Amino acid sequence: NAPIDIFYGIPSSVPSTDERLETTGGIIDCGAMKHLLKEEDVVCVGEIMNYRQIIQENDLEITKFLRYLQEEHPGYVIEGHCPSLLDLDLARFLYLGIDGDHTEHTLEEVKQRIENGMFFEIQDKMLKPEVLEYICENRLYEYCGFVTDDTMADVLYEKGQLNYVVQKAIETGFPVEMAIYCATYTPSRRMHLYDRGTIAPGKLADFLLLKDPAVIRPDYVYKNGVQIFAQKNG
């Protein structure tokens, strides 16, 4: 009964390394992925990590599943993990339908991803001034969103999670309104969660109230229109 919605991605890289390198507790093959696709709370294919292998081989379990998606579920959300891929290799990766990436990149790598239609997910280590400046100067807000990845419990407790990333982006020069936009609206659209991400008639009443929009420290939090948090000194 926790006041939070949890969605899942289909594990696409289990095991994440070659069986010749390490043993694994199990294998999620194409059949298992098809089964998971039927689950109500599954909204995407989780990050595909064997990016070098997948653009060279077509008999992998995940490659079979991607072909199935292209035939039976075109447009399904497929998340990638492709640090350093550029040019033709990046095109091969995108050709498989993998059009999201959250890993760390140089500015040139960011440009190529956005120019080729990939949704770029910005985590803490990608809050580089030159990257944020490029996005702002070219008004590329629709093509990116703020995310977190592998947040440890102590970091979550001490710094927060997405609120910390948004705050840091603002302090690095990202416009306040667009920082909030890229943490709410664009991620919702990316995951096809069209019932949220904006305050509008007919949408879920999930929102927070801030005393100062430039200080991402929630004073009040509402879930489905019900207040679930209030600062003690608020």
Language-model-derived ranges and their functions:
Residues 6, 45, 113, 149, ...:
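Divalent metal-coordination and catalytic microenvironments
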Residues 41-42, 73, 92-100, 114-120, ...:
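Glycine-enriched alpha-helix->loop->beta-strand junction motifs that scaffold or abut catalytic
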Residues 102-103, 121-127, 141-160, 202:
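Short acidic/histidine-rich active-site segments
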